[in-house]
Amino acid sequence: MVVSKSSPLIFERSKKGRYAYSLPKKEIDNGAVEKLLDDKFIRKNKAELPEVAELDLVRHYTELSNKNFGVDSGFYPLGSCTMKYNPKINEKIARIPGFAESHPLQDESQVQGSLEIIHSLQEELKEITGMDEVTLQPAAGAHGEWTALMIFKAFHQKNGEGHRDEVIVPDSAHGTNPASAAFAGFKAVTVKSNERGEVDIDDLKRVVNENTAAIMLTNPNTLGIFEKNIMDIRNIVHEAGGLLYYDGANLNAIMDKVRPGDMGFDAVHLNLHKTFTGPHGGGGPGSGPVGVKKELASFLPKPMVVKEDDVYKYDNDIENSIGRVKPFYGNFGIYLRAYTYIRTMGNKGLEEVSEAAVLNANYIKARLKDHFEIPYPQYCKHEFVLSGSKQKEHGVRTLDMAKRLLDFGVHPPTIYFPLNVEEGMMIEPTETESKETLDYFCDKMIEIANEAKEDPDKVLEAPHTTIIDRLDETKAARQPVLKFENLRSEKE
């Protein structure tokens, strides 16, 4: 296969007068748009769309697809992202015409099947999480975080405790946690980790006070370590009048083993695009449902989908609702994929998913422990963080090793996160990878570790085989080329 190092943009392929498809002869009056729309909405100049033949168009997108990388292309151990295989049966279900061609503004009587899917998925997620009610509206994980925090805020205000304006986040937390807290109008307060990578209970007691609104936790946490003192954490925060929020990014490690609701969490968000096999990695669409305990149910976004006398309907009568958080009812196509996955796997299957995810992560950790610094040596859950500090002694950083992995057809793990691990590399293999794939990855990681000692330039100059070499990251940050006009100016 011939692969070009550089591909012309679709605009650079454009030649005036070329076209790929002939539209039927128009039957609409030329002036119809002007009659229907206010002048301010009408374009004054023609859109600068590329003009290409159909063959050129097909080749352009085929070439781009060959350069893309996804979980169907190769191993994708991106820590905290759960890049598991997306079963193709999901796509078949999502393309059933009755689902794919429905419209959110259709009458409830015409979309009973779609509403049944929404309601059934709500019920499944309630069972999986141990929550009493679930809304599917939020469009992504961070959106779910914000939604839950707005529910917490409304709850505290209704109870006459609007002064609670602090949200506690661990120093190993996802960056979205403090960002969501700030966006919801709270102050983020950091709690330290102890030497085992868990929440430091003494430090938690220090930061909890009368202004504590909530604590945001992932369990297992971002280091892949289960917070074994979770019940103590629950008691400390609840006794201070605060609430517990569960970031569902790492639910893949504990399905059908333990539920957030049973650990004392008051609200949870899930990532259907991670744990429940919605395709992601290209920017979406995602889905971040939020589940809550009964004390918070009256604050959920409206509408909710309910079942009355075997009929499914939207319920807008939610007393203390924070209001709608997403147009229509969220990203329905992802609901279909998640529901298909849950029903395909069943309870036993989901339990086996978590067991395999944990086994795979610990297998990699065991194979790499003699070649890399492992800051937290105990057994992990679904992911773990290693440190490139040994390799840094030879002038090779984690970024360089990540670039070198590209030469072996592996997507690099998450790097420099969480922030409390020097030269961190967070590895999450998921349950869907074979032992052969895990061994290939480990072999290449060990090879890179040896190169860092014996031939560091080979790592420092990587990648060697990719279409794009290393970017000038400083220039990309300060002088980004974001539009075709920028590129044209650069070339001139």
Swiss-Prot record:
The gene is gcvPB. Belongs to the GcvP family. C-terminal subunit subfamily. GO terms for molecular function: glycine binding; glycine dehydrogenase (decarboxylating) activity; pyridoxal phosphate binding. It comes from the Bacteria. It catalyses: N(6)-[(R)-lipoyl]-L-lysyl-[glycine-cleavage complex H protein] + glycine + H(+) = N(6)-[(R)-S(8)-aminomethyldihydrolipoyl]-L-lysyl-[glycine-cleavage complex H protein] + CO2. GO terms for biological process: glycine decarboxylation via glycine cleavage system. GO terms for cellular component: cytosol; glycine cleavage complex. Its cofactor is pyridoxal 5'-phosphate. InterPro entries: Aminotrans_V_dom (IPR000192), GcvPB (IPR023012), GDC-P_C (IPR049316), GDC_P (IPR020581), PyrdxlP-dep_Trfase (IPR015424), PyrdxlP-dep_Trfase_major (IPR015421), PyrdxlP-dep_Trfase_small (IPR015422). Keywords: Oxidoreductase, Pyridoxal phosphate. The glycine cleavage system is composed of four proteins: P, T, L and H. In this organism, the P 'protein' is a heterodimer of two subunits. It is an enzyme of class 1 (oxidoreductase). It comes from Staphylococcus saprophyticus subsp. saprophyticus (strain ATCC 15305 / DSM 20229 / NCIMB 8711 / NCTC 7292 / S-41). Pfam families: Aminotran_5 (PF00266), GcvP2_C (PF21478). This is Probable glycine dehydrogenase (decarboxylating) subunit 2. Gene3D superfamilies: 6.20.440.10, Aspartate Aminotransferase, domain 1, Type I PLP-dependent aspartate aminotransferase-like (Major domain). Its EC number is 1.4.4.2. HAMAP family: GcvPB.
